[in-house]
Amino acid sequence: MDISSWFESIHVFLILLNGVFFRLAPLFFFLPFLNNGIISPSIRIPVIFLVASGLITSGKVDIGSSVFEHVYFLMFKEIIVGLLLSFCLSLPFWIFHAVGSIIDNQRGATLSSSIDPANGVDTSELAKFFNLFSAVVFLYSGGMVFILESIQLSYNICPLFSQCSFRISNILTFLTLLASQAVILASPVMIVLLLSEVLLGVLSRFAPQMNAFSVSLTIKSLLAIFIIFICSSTIYFSKVQFFLGEHKFFTNLFVR
């Protein structure tokens, strides 16, 4: 092998490495256990390149002259695919984050909101707990293998440096699924808190000397924790595992 072909092979390898990097990078920014709050940028970027180097040979890639002519457009396409894939993989974490926010809003504990280091947003304490809970169940149930399978599936649907179309119109379906699942999972606690509000209202009507507002937060918090304790080992745990088997649906929701 002469020097020119050696440099050409290095050039091709770097192009492939950057193409895979642009698809993987959004995953490390959106997933709660891989973003800035958990892994520092000085460590995360080399890890992305290391994972990308292992995925280069996952499929056959034809690099022709058109790739070099439209390299910026193709890199932008890889970023879009990575973003859509990140949205699909982050869906269970966003759902449980919304569940915690809804429950804290209903029990009147949003005053304790603080900056969540895993998401970088102002969030309630229960939302952070549910986010970490979903991440633990996700990883315990083989989440990293699921992520690699989803990446592999994305390359089968939309190969590297090839043309593919996006069904961006289905973003409304994605948002509907996010909101509906959050309300469904939070509904047991919401129903119990609504009944407690009715009982506290009756109590304040017949015993006005007892300030129902001063004890409402304590009572509703105890009831919410009790219902969460019952649902966490059944409904919530199985719901996270349900999303682990739906990578084909979520990936095909956007890319064809």
Swiss-Prot record:
Keyword Membrane recorded: yes
Domain of life, per lineage: Bacteria
Gene Ontology cellular-component annotations: plasma membrane
InterPro entries: T3SS_IM_R, T3SS_SpaR/YscT
Record bears the keyword Nuclease: no
Localization, UniProt: Cell membrane
Record membrane topology: Multi-pass membrane protein
Any Pfam family matching the protein: Bac_export_1
Keywords: Cell membrane, Membrane, Plasmid, Transmembrane, Transmembrane helix, Virulence
TM ranges: 13-33, 37-57, 79-99, 129-149, 183-203, 217-237
Chief place of localization: membrane
Record GO biological process: protein targeting
Annotated function: Required for surface presentation of invasion plasmid antigens. Could play a role in preserving the translocation competence of the ipa antigens. Required for invasion and for secretion of the three ipa proteins.
Family statement: Belongs to the FliR/MopE/SpaR family.
Full protein name: Surface presentation of antigens protein SpaR
UniProt organism field: Shigella flexneri
